[in-house]
Amino acid sequence: MHEKLIREINGEIADALLARKMPFAPSRKAALALLKVPGWTEGLEQMLPIRGRLECAHVLELCSCVLPRLAPRPEEGWLAFCTQYARERMYPGQGFAPDREEYEAGALFFLTVLQVMLDRERRAVPFDPLKDFQFLSSEEMGEYECGEEYRRFLAAFREEYVYEMMRLSEETTPFRTLGHIAGVHYIAMTVARGIREAGENVDLALVSAAAAAHDLGKFGCRPGERVPLLHYYYTDQWLLGRGMPAVSHIAANHSTWDLELDTLSMESLCLIYADFRSKQGRDEQGRETTILYPLEESFHIILRKLENVDQAKRRRYEFVYGKLHDFEDYMRSLGGRRPDRAAGGAEAPQGPGPDAPGRDGGQPDPAVGRAQPEADAPAEQRAEVRQHHRGRPLGQELAAAAGLSGCVRRVLHLSVRAAEDPGPGLPL
């Protein structure tokens, strides 16, 4: 029924395996031969067409007919092992996957198939700001001083299966770090684009890479280590080890506790502002979830959590909130401008075009370049995203805030809750 589509996907998987120089796939012919084992085509047929978010466990079921030919099954299971294996690739020597050599061939095969299938998912379902990334196109990143570091970031993000690891982590751990990171990237980039469109100077490549990397250090923390303190260090190490000092300077210094907000760059402010507004809580079933709050609401949530802390810490957060409120006022002042040309005389950028890369710089992202990516999707798919702004769907707000000033204004009071299986009683 989906013969052509299956051939296309098999070809993409074979090309990906060959590009990574897998020892078990020395040629495209050998890679395709792996996908001819009994059960593969039938399993892929059951997954097509893709109409919703894929589960890593379902992709593992697809791979179950191939994996025994490559490696024995890890004691903890393939999903848990591959989560730790990907962390070990990011942070060698941390002991996340001590038996990696025995299972490496199977892990690489599964992670590559998962990457291809998630690329397909991204093109099939509406954009979700708590799961997806809209990265800059090759043409766009070349405009910025940090463009070369940005290319290195996108390459590492894909080569080390960073996105796939975060999706796996959602199914193998109780944590939902992806939602927070993606949400921060969404807010930071919306703010940065609006500021640039208003004629101010901001490096979008630097903002994008720093926002997408700012909490990756959490995956480098070993059991027993203090994640709130050490994740800055591991973020710094991951970025510096891949030749991204400028990105590291922004990403690893986003704590609001020890920074002098009066001396921060525009890129740092975009990240700290976005991070302040992206909070993790619990839904009615007790599951961790990410919510993007308006600034004032986020501040009051923080204050409630700080009821039992000393006055010095409380005053620090009040100071930070005041500075970020000033930043919002600054953005509102920019919202009144409608320049024909951006800073430096160049035409004001209108956002990435339809051929811009997806969340990892791979396949083009069909949602990029639209004012509201969900607007063209069927109603039942749009409902999955569950974006709201002061009680109204975000799409209505974006329509009301069209134009250059809208890009600045539309994010100021944005409130987004996770769409992933929210449960029947979760208030939106």
Write out the residue ranges for each language-model feature.
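Divalent metal-dependent phosphate-bond-processing catalytic cores, especially two-metal-ion Mg2+/Mn2+ enzymes
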Residues: 2-152, 172-202, 213, 223, ...
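Short alpha-helical hairpin
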Residues: 147-167
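His-Asp-centered metal-binding catalytic motifs of divalent-metal-dependent phosphohydrolases/nucleases
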Residues: 184, 202-242, 248-258, 275
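Short linear motifs in low-complexity or flexible loops
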Residues: 367, 371-379, 383, 400-402, ...
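Polybasic, low-complexity intrinsically disordered segments
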Residues: 403-418
